[in-house]
């Protein structure tokens, strides 16, 4: 078996995530949590290096990240459409009370959920988008529930 860029990418992410997981459960958790923006940027870089269909959809990547950031800026500052919430220090620098890398997070998650629906052989892009959206909502529910538990909210 020959080693290719996908194998190397998986190994890099695996090592980075394991070190991060161990780090955030250690006495140095604040330091490791402060690396979250780097984690997102590394994940994005690996995603972009491994993406192969650049001719058709390259412009969707920056548009998705920007749209995600704009939606979050609106949400954080108005409470619409997600309700009242705020970002702490973990995601790094902010613009208009919103972590700059949140758009990158949206891009990564949308790319991942779209990739997971491709093997389903669903021809309708609307149904695939709906399934991807449901996956995102489920993930958000899991993240929000765990954050409420960590922060002591019900």
Language-model segments: which ranges?
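Aromatic-rich, lipid-facing transmembrane alpha helices and their immediate juxtamembrane interface loops
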Residues: 1-154
